[in-house]
């Protein structure tokens, strides 16, 4: 059957990377936190983390293009199975938690599109509280996603393409409207250009700036998720590396350019110093400001300019909903594929590794859907205790999601040392360049994770959060080691069973 399964084009792969990595909301958040002084930190994060890490992924992906297991296969073939399983299991677990939160979050942009504002806190149906209504919608969303995704990679690629196009269109609107405003206003920027100090009084201390560096580094995360799609890509020996390199360059330039353009239409002191502005609504406030400023530049009446602003916010809501949808489809399948199809089949019950007619591990996908749905219902209907439990889960996933970058970067020199691989794409041609790139990425990711853990302690003496963040990777590692040890014991007791 496998020869009938359609593969993804280069454009499809680029759009998938774009929806997985480029969060349109990251540039408004950066402008809100740091103004123009965010740009040097974004460039720093791209040069010292994102671009070298993306190039490592491109080399590994093109060399291991026939492997089904994504990052698990890469680490397994470079270092060893136990190392690979712990890193991949930790990464997969944190994406399950990501799905729990995002399935509920996705309704905010949807509500903004339909009603012109976030009304999710006012949704009451049949005596249910808003949190419970959103929880039920999130479960329905999970079921719909799994139902469509189980029908094949082509369905996922089509949806992520729509998401990727929506994000690109938002960026295009930002670019074209900002240029139009500049021309209409005689080249005048609403925000004074200053790359060294933040207009936000809360971001003047060294500690706050370091926390922003972490924010910038994490904005570039997610490219490893497309690793599981190498074998689903057309001509992967050429297209996979091309797709990653092209997407990495566009994303790196895109973030800094987007931050720069926000200052054309929005003055930080006038619009963003209001206490009602927060990281949850900043994207819609900035897009509304962009529309209103365009209306004013075109000499429309104040009411008409405000209406333009409201419609800009609505269109942003729709585009963000589509972008979330695209990311959700990729991330509901790719991490699961790495952990199920990459690892030895004997690790899992037989139905979990069985592929349907479309080449998808449908049973495993439905089990994941049930697990995520149970978590959502527990958090939505469990009251304060469940809410506290969810906050702790999120803290546990905080570090667990990015620690696998360390596992992957540390596996890279081992991958380069192998002499038996056909390498269609090689960028790091010397041992020195390999070690420098690995060292820089490892140092940057280690700093980001260590700082994330100690920040609550330094700022508020909050040891509880710090311990939960340390506990996450430890818990997921111990669970992975227990699963792997159980497999090893059964394998040594009955080698024939393991080979089945």
Curated annotation (Swiss-Prot):
One GO cellular component term: plasma membrane
Cytoplasmic side: 1-10, 59-83, 146-163, 231-243, 330-361, 416-433, 484-500
Keywords: Cell inner membrane, Cell membrane, Membrane, Transmembrane, Transmembrane helix, Transport
Membrane topology: Multi-pass membrane protein
Location(s) in or outside the cell: Cell inner membrane
Gene3D superfamilies registered for this protein in UniProt: Amino acid/polyamine transporter I
Protein name according to UniProt: Inner membrane transporter YjeM
Residues spanning the membrane: 11-31, 38-58, 84-104, 125-145, 164-184, 210-230, 244-264, 309-329, 362-382, 395-415, 434-454, 463-483
């Amino acid at each position: 059957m496998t020869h009938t399964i359609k593969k993804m084009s280069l454009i499809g792969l680029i759009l998938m990377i774009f929806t997985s990595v480029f969060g349109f909301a990251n540039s408004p958040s950066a402008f809100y936190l740091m103004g123009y002084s965010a740009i040097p930190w974004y460039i720093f994060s791209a040069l010292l983390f994102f671009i070298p890490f993306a190039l490592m992924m491109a080399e590994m992906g093109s060399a291991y293009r026939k492997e089904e297991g994504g990052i698990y296969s890469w680490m397994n073939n470079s270092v060893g199975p136990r190392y690979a399983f712990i890193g991949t299991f930790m990464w997969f677990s944190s994406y399950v938690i990501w799905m729990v939160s995002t399935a509920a979050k996705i309704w905010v942009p949807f509500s903004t599109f339909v009603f012109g504002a976030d009304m999710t806190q006012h949704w009451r149906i049949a005596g249910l509280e808003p949190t419970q209504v959103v929880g039920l919608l999130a479960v329905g969303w999970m079921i719909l996603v799994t139902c469509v995704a189980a029908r094949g990679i082509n369905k996922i690629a089509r949806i992520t393409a729509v998401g990727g196009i929506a994000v690109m269109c938002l960026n295009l609107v930002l670019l074209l409207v900002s240029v139009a405003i500049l021309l209409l206003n005689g080249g005048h920027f609403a925000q004074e250009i200053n790359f060294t100090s933040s207009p936000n009084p809360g971001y003047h201390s060294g500690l706050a700036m370091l926390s922003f560096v972490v924010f910038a580094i994490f904005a570039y995360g997610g490219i490893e998720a497309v690793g599981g799609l190498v074998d689903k890509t057309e001509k992967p020996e050429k297209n996979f590396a091309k797709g990653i390199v092209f997407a990495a360059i566009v994303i790196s330039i895109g973030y800094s350019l987007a931050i720069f353009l926000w200052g054309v239409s929005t003055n930080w002191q006038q619009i963003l110093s209001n206490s009602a502005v927060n990281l949850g609504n900043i994207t819609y406030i900035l897009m509304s400001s962009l529309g209103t400023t365009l209306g004013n530049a075109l000499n429309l009446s104040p009411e008409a300019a405000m209406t333009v602003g409201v419609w800009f916010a609505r269109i942003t809501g729709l585009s963000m909903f589509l972008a979330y949808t695209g990311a959700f489809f990729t991330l509901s399948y790719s991490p699961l594929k790495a952990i199920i199809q990459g690892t030895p089949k004997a690790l899992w019950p037989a139905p979990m590794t069985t592929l349907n007619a479309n080449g998808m591990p449908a049973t495993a996908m439905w089990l994941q859907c049930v697990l995520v749905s149970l978590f959502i219902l527990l958090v939505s209907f469990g009251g304060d205790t469940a809410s506290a439990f969810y906050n702790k889960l999120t803290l546990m996933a905080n570090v667990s999601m990015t620690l696998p970058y360390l596992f992957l970067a540390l596996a890279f020199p081992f991958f380069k040392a192998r002499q038996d691989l056909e390498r269609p794409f090689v960028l790091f041609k010397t041992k020195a360049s390999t070690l420098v790139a690995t060292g820089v990425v490892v140092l940057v990711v280690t700093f980001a994770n260590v700082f994330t853990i100690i920040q609550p302690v330094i700022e508020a003496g909050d040891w509880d959060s710090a311990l939960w963040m340390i506990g996450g990777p430890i818990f997921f590692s111990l669970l992975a080691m227990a699963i792997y040890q159980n497999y090893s014991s059964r394998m040594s007791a009955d080698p024939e069973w393991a080979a089945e």
